[in-house]
Curated annotation (Swiss-Prot):
Keywords: Chloroplast, Membrane, Photosynthesis, Photosystem I, Plastid, Thylakoid, Transmembrane, Transmembrane helix. One of its GO terms (cellular component) is photosystem I. Belongs to the PsaI family. The keyword Transmembrane helix applies. It is found in: Plastid, Chloroplast thylakoid membrane. May help in the organization of the PsaL subunit. It is a single-pass membrane protein. The keyword Chloroplast applies. PSI consists of a core antenna complex that captures photons, and an electron transfer chain that converts photonic excitation into a charge separation. The eukaryotic PSI reaction center is composed of at least 11 subunits. Only detected in green leaves and not etioplasts; PSI is only assembled in green leaves. The chain crosses the membrane at residues 10-30. This is Photosystem I reaction center subunit VIII.
Amino acid sequence: MTDLNLPSIFVPLVGLVFPAIAMTSLFLYVQKKKIV
């Protein structure tokens, strides 16, 4: 049962964390370009 619970926790976690990192890096890239 624990093996079935782990993916259900990790999938949404990765699905939220990965886009968050991508958005943050993109935002910082745009901010750096605007300043320069």
